Amino acid sequence: MSLKEKLIVNVHKEEQPHAHNKITVVGVGAVGMACAISILMKDLADELALVDVIEDKLKGEMLDLQHGSLFLRTPKIVSGKDYAVTAHSKLVIITAGARQQEGESRLNLVQRNVNIFKFIIPNVVKYSPDCKLLVVSNPVDILTYVAWKISGFPKHRVIGSGCNLDSARFRHLMAEKLGIHPLSCHGWIVGEHGDSSVPVWSGVNVAGVSLKGLHPDMGTDGDKENWKQVHKQVVDSAYEVIKLKGYTSWAIGLSVADLAETIMKNLRRVHPVSTMVKGMHGINDDVFLSVPCVLGYSGITDVVKMTLKSEEEDKLRKSADTLWGIQKELQF
């Protein structure tokens, strides 16, 4: 009789059930692991699967997380190069992809990542045909489109992390200027994640008080207080962090866990995430851009119709045209 048999009497033979709330993270670089730890610390999954092509790094990251099991409430952490470990995932988060090389054009980076996605997406779909896909790899709006095209999923199940982080950075910087918590500063950044994102100044408020109502010059070039600089800082923030520490990780990891929480718990919170915007704001192509979306267990269920100024809509359409210009050149 083994020690285990002396200690424990089995009263019910359990057939191995599937996890109910399984999450997979594809790519165990700095961003993937920041997503993983943030998800673990929010207790969002009963099983976490990690996938990557670099097997030693992958196993090391899995072991390192497993060694923290006592301090976590996720009973199963698995990893593998083979996508079989991802089977029955409810949410699959894609952070894998090539990093931009110095002097490399965005279009070139896109094509390299399309080739990586051509391998990843069919494997994800094979083992988790009903999952939601959350794309984080950059350029996120184009790669969300790519994931949608390759997966054959309905558009509500393919979500780009989009401007969720841009909006969080915006609220943080605004809050610092005003001396209050970011949760109490409301403001939205929409459109393309990154350089051509669009701050919706008309909607910025604290306690329902419109800041543009109090300070009509807000966000314009003639503004004495230079609030436009806040949006510029949002755009520059990733470049600044990359220059200082080599990459960004913690904020995007927390932002992704925030989205994962809304999806896994069916919270129906509204987030600025990348979705198919054809037919909205005068956009006529199959492009993905961030707009305020209601998120829940089935993915994106609704989109909030924003009231945008004509110049804001122009910026959105310009982004859409740029993205479509790149997308139509892609080889699938």
From Swiss-Prot:
Substrate binds at residues 106, 138, 169, 248. The keyword NAD applies. GO terms for biological process: lactate metabolic process. Pathway: Fermentation; pyruvate fermentation to lactate; (S)-lactate from pyruvate: step 1/1. Its EC number is 1.1.1.27. Pfam families: Ldh_1_C, Ldh_1_N. The keyword Nucleotide-binding does not apply. Its main location: cytoplasm. It catalyses: (S)-lactate + NAD(+) = pyruvate + NADH + H(+). NAD(+) binds at residues 29-57, 99, 138. InterPro entries: L-lactate/malate_DH (IPR001557), L-lactate_DH (IPR011304), L-lactate_DH_AS (IPR018177), Lactate/malate_DH_C (IPR022383), Lactate/malate_DH_N (IPR001236), Lactate_DH/Glyco_Ohase_4_C (IPR015955), NAD(P)-bd_dom_sf (IPR036291). Interconverts simultaneously and stereospecifically pyruvate and lactate with concomitant interconversion of NADH and NAD(+). Belongs to the LDH/MDH superfamily. LDH family. Homotetramer. This is L-lactate dehydrogenase A chain.
